[in-house]
């Protein structure tokens, strides 16, 4: 016969072998439960374990009148009224543990309702409409972006805008509205495009002027060895041909030309 290792069977077997004296709580509980008389003013022996093979009875759900007296009204409404609502107990669990019900508190519907009202006034709950919950997965998508979205122009729109810019760099408001309506754009988009295009045009103009000035400075200018410009180069050559000969060269030529007798 296989041996059973269930905790309930072992606990119930020990409870049946060793009967507890009357007026004492049961020997063991499946979970740590405070004595029932501390919450409802019942005697310690009010709750007891049933026979083997049955589940244990919760000590908070059975009253002394149901066990040892005539049937009366159910204790579940009293149990619900003795504690604060579920929402407040869920939100203030640590506070609920600290302020437990004392053994000497009077029981009854009026006392329980007064205790619940006092608890709610002592610990007011915030308005749940003030909170805005955002899921973790979609937090990056739902947050507002500070950057402005760039407009993706089509090739046809860019061609028409460039053509209009070549004819007129500054548009009037009426012309801007006409272009925006024709290209299926907003007036603000057309205005921003023309502003950016003018800035780009100015940058391109400054760059071309700078490159042109640097090329003229490097390639232009007359050579330092020549004292005359290119326009008077012919005059300079004529002046060089008419320069007088030096005295030494003239005397040498005279000596060579003398004839001996």
Swiss-Prot record:
Main location as per UniProt: nucleus
Keywords: Activator, Developmental protein, DNA-binding, Homeobox, Nucleus, Transcription, Transcription regulation
Annotated region described as Disordered, given as residue ranges: 201-261
Residues in the DNA-binding region annotation: 146-205
The organism's place on the tree of life at top rank: Eukaryota
SMART domains: HOX (SM00389)
Location relative to the cell: Nucleus
PANTHER family assigned: GS HOMEOBOX 1, GS HOMEOBOX 2
Family listed: Belongs to the Antp homeobox family.
Function: Probable transcription factor that binds to the DNA sequence 5'-GC[TA][AC]ATTA[GA]-3'. Activates the transcription of the GHRH gene. Plays an important role in pituitary development.
Protein name: GS homeobox 1
């Amino acid at each position: 016969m296989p041996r059973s290792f269930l905790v309930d069977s072992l606990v119930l077997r020990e409870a049946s072998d060793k009967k507890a004296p009357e007026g004492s709580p049961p020997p063991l509980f499946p979970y740590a439960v405070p004595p029932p008389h501390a919450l409802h003013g019942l005697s310690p022996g009010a709750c007891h374990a049933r026979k083997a093979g049955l589940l244990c009875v919760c000590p908070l759900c059975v009253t002394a009148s149901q066990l040892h007296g005539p049937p009366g009204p159910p204790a579940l409404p009293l149990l619900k009224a003795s504690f604060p609502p579920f929402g407040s107990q869920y939100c203030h669990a640590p506070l609920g543990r600290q302020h437990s019900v004392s053994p000497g508190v009077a029981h009854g519907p009026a006392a329980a309702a007064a205790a619940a009202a006092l608890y709610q006034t002592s610990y007011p709950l915030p308005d749940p409409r003030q909170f805005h919950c955002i899921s973790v997965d979609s937090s990056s998508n739902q947050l507002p972006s500070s950057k402005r979205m760039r407009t993706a122009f089509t090739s046809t729109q860019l061609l028409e805008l460039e053509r209009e810019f070549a004819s007129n760099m500054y548009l009037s408001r009426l012309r801007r509205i006409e272009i925006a309506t024709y290209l299926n754009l907003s007036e603000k988009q057309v205005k921003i495009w023309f502003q950016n295009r003018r800035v780009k045009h100015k940058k391109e103009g400054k760059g071309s002027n700078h490159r042109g000035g640097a090329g003229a400075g490097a390639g232009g200018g007359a050579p330092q060895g020549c004292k005359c410009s290119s326009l008077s180069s012919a005059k300079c050559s004529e002046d060089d041909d008419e320069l007088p000969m030096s005295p030494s060269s003239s005397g040498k030529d005279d000596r060579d030309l003398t004839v001996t007798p």
